[in-house]
């Protein structure tokens, strides 16, 4: 996975490292990265949609997630998670994220998540709503209605 240009991300969120995130090797355990990415996605969707996520009515689920690690995160570093939507298809969209050290800009990892529109009543995939498509478009400032890249 290539390292994207950090300037292409509008959404940034500080990550609070916890002592328990660190393993016996002295760095943040790789499984914790997904917690950081999940928090970044939750805040991103809140900003994109203009409201907090309704946990009683989930309208998207993860179909695939892939993470590439480039450098370890160590306790005491100032880490931020950058998040953006890369593409919107008919029933799915792609979220691109990056963890990096704020002071040096060193990229720690990059994550790509494919999310699918979901109806919790039927438990089936559904098309991405026009409203969500418009919200991504407006937030990301796309000229192409399906995203960039």
Regions found by a protein language model. Give the residues of each.
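Short structured motifs
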Residues: 63-69, 80-82, 95
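Membrane-helix exit/interface motif
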Residues: 48-49
């Amino acid at each position: 996975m290539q390292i994207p240009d950090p300037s292409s991300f509008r959404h940034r969120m500080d990550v609070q490292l916890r002592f328990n995130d660190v393993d016996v090797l002295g760095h943040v355990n790789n499984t914790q990265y997904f917690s950081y990415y999940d928090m970044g996605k939750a805040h991103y969707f809140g900003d994109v949609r203009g409201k907090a996520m309704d946990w009683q009515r989930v309208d998207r689920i993860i179909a695939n997630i892939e993470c590439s690690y480039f450098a370890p995160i160590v306790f005491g570093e100032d880490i931020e998670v950058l998040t953006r939507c890369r593409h919107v298809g008919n029933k799915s969209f792609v979220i691109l994220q990056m963890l990096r050290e704020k002071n040096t800009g060193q990229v720690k990892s990059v994550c790509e998540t494919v999310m699918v529109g979901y109806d919790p009543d039927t438990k089936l995939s559904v098309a991405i709503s026009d409203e969500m498509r418009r919200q991504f478009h407006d937030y990301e400032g796309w000229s192409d209605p399906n995203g960039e890249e």
